[in-house]
Amino acid sequence: MKVLYGTPEFMAPEVVSFEPVSFSTDMWSVGVICYILLSGESPFQGDTDMETLSNVTAARWDFEEETFSEISQQAKDFISQLLQKDPRRRLPSAGALLHPWLQHSQPSSSKVLSKERIRQFLARRKWQKTGKALLALKRLT
């Protein structure tokens, strides 16, 4: 199946490229969600949807030192295995459930996730949606 539907920063590269989608497409989105939950930032979000889609297509992302310095190596490995550009190289759902990061019963860090970063992330998305709505209205008039 081929589709182009979704929120740009959560789309897998194969969706942007109109290539067939599969379960591994959803695993990409799980990687994006984990990145956001741990950092309060999107790995691919640009200033515009086109910039975001370009970042996704190139699989251009990294673990910023300031944000991820206290995040475990296992968590970063989990995300890295999910954000593979090639869907065949992505961690499948069964492998994800067996990943050491999810198998650990005790958190290895006492770091508190930044509520402010999450708020900023959500506020930015809200403004971008408002801008898109205004552009759509402008096209109708």
Model-derived features: where do they sit?
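Conserved activation segment of eukaryotic-like protein kinases, specifically the C-terminal portion
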Residues: K2-M11
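A conserved short helix/loop substructure at the end of the activation segment
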Residues: L83-G95
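C-terminal regulatory tails of eukaryotic serine/threonine kinases
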Residues: A94-T141
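Conserved C-terminal C-lobe helix
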Residues: E70-L82
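Conserved end of the kinase activation segment
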Residues: V15-S24
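Structural helix C-cap motif within protein kinase domains
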Residues: S39-S42
